[in-house]
Structures are given as structure tokens and as C-alpha cells.
Amino acid sequence: MASQGTKRSYEQMETGGERQNANEIRASVGRMVGGIGRFYIQMCTELKLSDNEGRLIQNSITIERMVLSAFDERRNKYLEEHPSTGRDPKKTGGPIYRRRDGKWVRELVLYDKEELRRIWRQANNGEDATAGLTHLMIWHSNLNDATYQRTRALVRTGMDPRMCSLMQGSTLPRRSGAAGAAVKGVGTMVMELIRMIKRGVNDRNFWRGENGRRTRIAYERMCNILKGKFQTAAQRAMMDQVRESRNPGNAEIEDLIFLARSALILRGAVAHKSCLPACVYGLAVASGYDFEREGYSLVGIDPFRLLQNSQVFSLIRPNENPAHKSQLVWMACHSAAFEDLRVSSFIRGTRVLPRGQLSTRGVQIASNENMETMNSSTLELRSKYWAIRTRSGGNTNQQRASAGQVSVQPSFSVQRNLPFERATIMAAFTGNPEGRTSDMRTEIIRMMENSRPEDVSFQGRGVFELSDEKATNPIVPSFDMSNEGSYFFGDNAEEYDN
């Protein structure tokens, strides 16, 4: 990984800040989540939500989506230029759930976008507070990552469903900025680039003219973002070739798919942040907590602390298991959809199950679902230990690319060895080794063949007691390494549909 000298920390990206010292970063991240909390409290007042209704995660998501929609300038412009009947482009809305006579009822609210922008700015000292909006987008993205599998999207772009662990952030909107780019997985970036190249192949004018020049700049920027995620020289050199191609086409798509496969062992560096639902920040602000004064970090103990004493509810469908629903949201809160289940289980203190064994569907409730049979239950979001979130793919300190598992992108920087079936992965490389990038391909394959599953990732990094906020006494967990620890492995989760 490049030294911190050349990279802003992702806390800085998150807050759009220039270089700051640790205290300034903690303060500006605190200001950001405090603003989200103040906004949420104000919205609960506007919508006349009771305490319990304000703690309902479905209401939180609706309120978050409304403010994101209010600030989506490109879409708002599009809606005003292409008016559709029965839809007011100046309004946005969604389902709000209220408790009436011992039942949950759904009420569709409509809100003026201008009014939402006003309330948001007012909660954020009059600023647009784009960082807070991005934070909400990342929370929604992490929730999608934990809930849905992207097999169909992978197959559509010619990638392999086994690469699902590379798909972090695949539902993030384009406008999510540097903080969004930091949390996107290698597979997500590859998929965006392939879609772009395919458009260029099918549409002669895609790269031409004034628009084409802008497209080209976007293409090269995306290539550089992806290059920055790779940790070996050969992978980066291959990205340079993809970026410099005069007329990107099938050869580039081949190279990108090859690189995505290589990332199953030579892991990319992908950031992880604990982004919590707005209602959690709202509860803390309402109880008098001053985030900006106390400081806050998305990658340390703070989110764990916040979840230890927040009570959040969720609607539960008749045949869903509340414990499973809790696990889903816990994973989303800690951006742990692609983490090794054994690591997650150890930190959480209860067994974390693979997606296919969970009796729960997504958190959001469709408008045609019957509310009569809906119950609600408290989400169990507490943990036994905390661990520092990582932005590395889990490499050994010898800076040799270490083994990664077909199905894991570490979220927590906790020592473990990553078992993987080399045969499974290498089988994906029976392909053409010729072409412009043959020497790089050969080198990448050689590195993959030499990587040893028993190499330890994050040497010496452990988990910490919740009382150990300065991370002074690491506890290095020992894992049963005999079984695959992947969440989506051999799975039947629903697909994500926009």
C-alpha cells in the first residue's frame, strides 16, 4: 500500500477535508455524523413519529432515501425535463410505519425536496454536507452487500459468480465521490469499466466529440482508482495498459476479467467503514451526546460503542427469524458482508451464519406486502469485542501478496490465515496466456501459484475488549481453519434488483 504520505485517509475523503491531524479528522467525522443525527431528530418531529417509531430501521431508511433523492441533482434535472404523469418531480417520499391499535400500519408520505434540503442544511450548519449524504449512501450499499448476491450482474458482464466477494459497493451511486470509490471492491470497478467499454464498442460516438473527451477522462479516472486498489506491481502495470489503450475493446475486457480473477488470491485494498443508520446517530444526539466535541471514527471503537447502547427495531415478516434479521443488519453496520464468518463470529460473540442459512429477506418492505401480519422486534446489534476496520486486502507484513480466500475480503484487521482452494481458483486461469499482457499475466499467475494459504494475514493484529478503547491489549483469536468461512458460498440469496 502506498504510504500515508500520498493518500488521504478515508476519514478525510469521507469529510471532504484536506490534510488534517488525527484530532481534526475525529472532529470533522463527528461533525458529519452529528449532522445526520440532528437531521433525523428534526424529521421525526416533522413526521410526528413517536420514540419507538423513530427507532424503526425501516423508517430510518425511508428518511435517508428521501434526503438522498432531494440532493440527487442529475436525477432531479432529468425528472423535470421528462415529466411523467402522476409524478411530481419536486416531491419525494416513501413508506412511514406507525404503531396504531397494537398493529403496524404503512403510510405513504410525500415531501417537498426543497423543504428536505432546507432541513438537512439547517442540521448541518447551513452547509450542503455532501460527506453526510455519502455516508448514508455507503450505509445503504453495505446493507445491499449483506442482503443480496450479484450473480446475475456478474454473469451479464462476463465475470464469474464466484467473484461475488469482490463486489463490495456495487450498488453505490456514481455520485458517491472519493469516499465511495474507497469502499468499492475490485469486482465493482471492473464491472463499471466493462460496461463502459461495451458501450464504446456498440456506440461509435461514445468516445468522440466533446462528450467523448469527458467520457475518456472518466474512464481513465476509474482505471486509476482500480489500479490503486491493486497491491502488486504486475497487476498495476496491467491496469496502466488498460488505461492507455487508444480504443478500448475486447482485449481490455479480457485483461480486466483476468485481473478480477487474480484478485481472488492477490487481494485488492478496499476500505471498510462502519456506517450506521441515521436513527442510531439521532438517538445519540437526542440523548445529549456531542459528536463533534467527543470526536468520532468510522474505523475504530466508536461505532461498536454506539451500537452497544442503541435500541433499534425492525419490522419482521411472519416466517422470518429476528436473530437472523439482526445478523444481517449487524453485518451491514460493520461492512462485513465479505468478511470471514469465523472472524465476524468471534467479534460479535455469537455464531454468524452464511447467507443461505438465514431465514430473513431484505430489511425494506415492499408496498404490496401485507402489514396485518407484521410484527416488530429489537435488533441485537451488540458485539463482544471490537476490531479495527481494514483497507488492505490482508497482506503479510513481508509485503508479499498473501493468500486470500475465494470468498473473503477482510473487513477487520485481525490476524488469520486465509484458507482457499488453489485448484478452484487456478482453474479459472485456463485461458489464453498470449496477447499484449502475456509477461504480466505469467508473473501474476506465478505469484498466485506461490502464495501459501498458511501465510498469516495482518500479523499480530487482534481484537480488543470493549473497555480497551486505546487498543492496548490485542487478543489474537485462534480459528478453526478447516472450513471455508464465506458468507455467500454456495448460496441462494436473492438477487439485487434496482
Swiss-Prot record:
Subunit structure: Homomultimerizes to form the nucleocapsid. May bind host exportin-1/XPO1. Binds to viral genomic RNA. Protein-RNA contacts are mediated by a combination of electrostatic interactions between positively charged residues and the phosphate backbone and planar interactions between aromatic side chains and bases.
Domain of life (superkingdom): Viruses
Positions of short motif Bipartite nuclear localization signal: 198-216
Chief localization: virion
GO molecular function: RNA binding; structural molecule activity
Cellular localisation: Virion; Host nucleus
Protein name per UniProt: Nucleoprotein
Entry's Gene Ontology BP terms: symbiont entry into host cell; viral penetration into host nucleus
Pfam families noted in UniProt: Flu_NP
Sequence motif Unconventional nuclear localization signal, residues: 1-18
Cited function: Encapsidates the negative strand viral RNA, protecting it from nucleases. The encapsidated genomic RNA is termed the ribonucleoprotein (RNP) and serves as template for transcription and replication. The RNP needs to be localized in the host nucleus to start an infectious cycle, but is too large to diffuse through the nuclear pore complex. NP comprises at least 2 nuclear localization signals that are responsible for the active RNP import into the nucleus through cellular importin alpha/beta pathway.
Family annotation (InterPro entries): Flu_NP
GO CC terms in record: helical viral capsid; host cell; host cell nucleus; ribonucleoprotein complex; viral nucleocapsid
Keywords: Capsid protein, Helical capsid protein, Host nucleus, Host-virus interaction, Ribonucleoprotein, RNA-binding, Viral nucleoprotein, Viral penetration into host nucleus, Virion, Virus entry into host cell
The keyword Nuclease appears for this protein: no
Post-translational modification: Late in virus-infected cells, may be cleaved from a 56-kDa protein to a 53-kDa protein by a cellular caspase. This cleavage might be a marker for the onset of apoptosis in infected cells or have a specific function in virus host interaction.
Annotated stretches, region: Disordered: 1-22
Record family assignment: Belongs to the influenza viruses nucleoprotein family.
